[in-house]
Amino acid sequence: MSIYKALTIAGSDSGGGAGIQADIKTFQELDVFGMSAITAVTAQNTLGVHGVHPLTVETLRQQIDAVAEDLRPDAVKTGMLWNADMIEEVARKIDEYGFNRVIVDPVMIAKGGASLLRDESVATLKELLIPRSYAITPNVPEAETLTGMTISSLDDRKKAAEQLVKMGAQHVIIKGGHQPEDNHITDLLFDGSMFMQITHPYINTKHTHGTGCTFAAALTAQTAKGDSIHQAFEVAANFVREAVENTLGIGSGHGPTNHFAFKRNSLNTSR
């Protein structure tokens, strides 16, 4: 039996809803062996981020080397990278180990509004990571920051996706959670030549912490298994939809999604 492996390079979320915790849970649910290289330790829960403690670049380097030299991931996901030095190191390691299935989730702001990427690091991300990405998965605010565009419609998202491909991304997925229309959400994929849209009903819930991480992790898992970008996009969109529809309802603020829902359809939260 083939064992597919995925590496997440991201921050740790003590609340378990986002970051490497969400990534590893998602990998596991999709039958992919998950590995991690932690960029920062965050103290957070459903009420917000209470502290961000970046690790050193050397610590990050050692983690990536340890995984890459022995376990050889089939796909790599990047999440919270915090500063330009970390982004530069990740880019070096992508080149050193020849990672060619890199999913870039350009994490910038936490659900509660806390900054997870230094402002001066955005230019480095654009210069070094976008051209090395197999796919980049921004939400609308992140796509606006990366392109400098104002995005207020699906047509605007299409133009932004085309711009991100011109910046070097092979594939672009701009998620629609920040921009519901007619009580529906549309996620948009641009593969460099054609668009693919997945539309599903808008779910009115505050329990959406970690949806961006989870989407990108599902995309990474399916990519590690050899799916095409279109197949992986469909699985990722459905994975997140199930996770939000079958919310766990834990915590007093923006609660996490249900990473168990895709396989089990729903989790019996009474037990």
UniProtKB/Swiss-Prot annotation:
Organism of provenance: Bacillus subtilis (strain 168)
Class of enzymatic activity (EC top level): transferase
Summarizing the function annotation, the protein's role is: Catalyzes the phosphorylation of hydroxymethylpyrimidine phosphate (HMP-P) to HMP-PP, and of HMP to HMP-P. Shows no activity with pyridoxal, pyridoxamine or pyridoxine.
Determine if Membrane is one of this entry's keywords. no
Task: Enumerate the UniProt keywords alphabetically.
Answer: ATP-binding, Kinase, Nucleotide-binding, Thiamine biosynthesis, Transferase
Q: Which family does it belong to?
A: Belongs to the ThiD family.
Q: Which Gene Ontology BP annotations are present? A: thiamine biosynthetic process; thiamine diphosphate biosynthetic process
Q: In which pathway does it act?
A: Cofactor biosynthesis; thiamine diphosphate biosynthesis; 4-amino-2-methyl-5-diphosphomethylpyrimidine from 5-amino-1-(5-phospho-D-ribosyl)imidazole: step 2/3; Cofactor biosynthesis; thiamine diphosphate biosynthesis; 4-amino-2-methyl-5-diphosphomethylpyrimidine from 5-amino-1-(5-phospho-D-ribosyl)imidazole: step 3/3
Catalytic activity, EC? 2.7.1.49, 2.7.4.7
Q: Which domain of life is it from?
A: Bacteria
Keyword DNA repair listed? The answer is no
Protein name as annotated: Hydroxymethylpyrimidine/phosphomethylpyrimidine kinase
Lineage, uppermost ranks: Bacteria, Bacillati, Bacillota, Bacilli, Bacillales
The catalytic activity, as recorded, is: 4-amino-5-hydroxymethyl-2-methylpyrimidine + ATP = 4-amino-2-methyl-5-(phosphooxymethyl)pyrimidine + ADP + H(+); 4-amino-2-methyl-5-(phosphooxymethyl)pyrimidine + ATP = 4-amino-2-methyl-5-(diphosphooxymethyl)pyrimidine + ADP
Q: Name one GO molecular function term.
A: hydroxymethylpyrimidine kinase activity
UniProt-annotated binding residues for 4-amino-5-hydroxymethyl-2-methylpyrimidine: 44
Naming one, the record's GO cellular component terms include: cytosol
Q: Which PANTHER family match?
A: HYDROXYMETHYLPYRIMIDINE_PHOSPHOMETHYLPYRIMIDINE KINASE THI20-RELATED, PHOSPHOMETHYLPYRIMIDINE KINASE
Pfam family, any one: Phos_pyr_kin
Q: Which InterPro entries match?
A: HMP/HMP-P_kinase_dom, PM/HMP-P_kinase-1, Ribokinase-like
